[in-house]
């Protein structure tokens, strides 16, 4: 008898983002995934680069623990690519908007580039 494992459904990403479910989000990444983040403090020449599901899971746990809302504004995907927009708002009113583009492998996120714009 053989057993097979099924990758978590990428279609669950908007719910996991909205509900700040870091574990469900992390489960959508490949073990060797690379997450690159570009923002005002880390431009294209010096982005934040996280390598591996464990590092990405730690970052997601930090973000999801913050007192803020996460509202997915759009989400599209096929077998190879995905993209999501997320409007975030901290309790003090500060807003952040994130756009992410992802390359998929075997139903999991293998590479992601996120661009963040923060209120100043």
Each model region followed by its residue ranges:
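A beta-strand edge to alpha-helix "cap/lid" segment located at domain peripheries
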Residues: 2, 58-120
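Short, low-complexity N-terminal intrinsically disordered segments enriched in polar/charged residues
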Residues: 1-27, 31
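Short charge-dense sequence patches
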Residues: 3-15, 48-53, 109-112
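A solvent-exposed, acidic/Ser-Thr-rich amphipathic alpha-helical stretch
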Residues: 3, 24-78
